[in-house]
């Protein structure tokens, strides 16, 4: 901190006036490049945030790595699944994550379904458009995937605000 004292990050955040954290969760990050942002890591960080007096937002990427406008990769273990199967996986992942976090006594204030989803999520199934234009059924598929996450989120955290994340919106 400014006095030169070492502090845990959530404690320091609270001391300097922050009041919330946004924690991303990936499906299987070890399949890519790191061991962070899986359910166990997010649960530990959410508990530390709660103990520091911070509100918690959970940001679901539905990917094994960063999901952004140029990269909305379906998790490796979910590749090749049908839309119906993906909806089940989305709901299971949301339930498992939020159940783990809330089991630690953490109240989740906000839940973000997808990250920077202006062109959908979990491509190609949830993709909205490509260089040739809008994809047939793109919005319908995206909304179904989003609602699978939304419904699961409200099941575990009925008081939380649930939202999409649209960059450039």
State the predicted function of each range:
Residues 5-70, 75, 134-163:
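Aromatic-lined substrate-binding rim segments of carbohydrate-active enzymes
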Residues 3-11, 96-97, 168-169:
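Alpha-helical scaffolding within the catalytic cores
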Residues 39-40, 68-169:
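Active-site cleft segment of glycoside hydrolase catalytic domains centered on the general acid/base Glu
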């Amino acid at each position: 901190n400014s006095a030169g004292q070492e502090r845990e990050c959530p404690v320091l955040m609270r001391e300097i006036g922050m009041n919330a954290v946004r924690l991303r969760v990936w499906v299987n990050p070890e399949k890519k490049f790191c061991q962070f942002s899986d359910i166990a890591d997010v649960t530990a960080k959410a508990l530390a945030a709660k103990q520091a007096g911070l509100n918690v937002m959970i940001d679901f990427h539905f990917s094994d790595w960063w999901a952004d406008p140029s990269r909305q990769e379906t998790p490796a273990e979910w590749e090749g699944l049908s839309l119906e199967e993906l909806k089940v996986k989305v709901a299971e992942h949301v339930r498992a994550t939020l159940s783990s976090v809330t089991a630690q006594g953490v109240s989740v204030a906000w839940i973000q379904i997808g990250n920077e989803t202006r062109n959908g999520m979990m491509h190609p199934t949830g993709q909205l458009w490509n260089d040739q234009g809008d994809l047939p059924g793109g919005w319908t598929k995206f909304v179904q995937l989003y609602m699978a996450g939304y419904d699961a989120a409200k099941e575990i955290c009925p008081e939380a605000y649930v939202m999409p994340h649209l960059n450039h919106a």
